[in-house]
């Protein structure tokens, strides 16, 4: 049996909090990023991530569950056709919260919550190229370090030979 959340709720009553989170999630999926208070952003994050996980599954049952929360069919359509497939290979962490300072009027701490962009093919190719560059740089460093060690080894031998000549 579901238990009500302990402590203060956003907006006063449980029903108002439920509607507030649904509207915040709708705006987040519609615009990709929204500016809100830190408290609302922290409450929205797990709520929105559960909806994205349902969208990733993409079956009728999950679509109907999301439609119970977000009543705008166009937003649900974009959630299931664009946002869900975008995070197909991502196991979680679909949102990011960035603090942006306090609001001017009431000094409330504000934050931006946004959908994290999934890696596109171009970004993956760039990442692979950077990894290859780093690997080649490490290989080059290893090659330059190996001759340096050989040079260091020859110096003590030369010094030892000079010392034996002096004796």
UniProtKB/Swiss-Prot annotation:
Signal peptide: none annotated. The keyword Ribonucleoprotein applies. Residues 124-167 are annotated as: Disordered. Keywords: Ribonucleoprotein, Ribosomal protein. Part of the 50S ribosomal subunit. Contacts protein L32. Belongs to the bacterial ribosomal protein bL17 family. NCBIfam families: L17 (TIGR00059). This is Large ribosomal subunit protein bL17. The lineage of its organism: Bacteria, Bacillati, Actinomycetota, Actinomycetes, Kitasatosporales. The gene is rplQ.
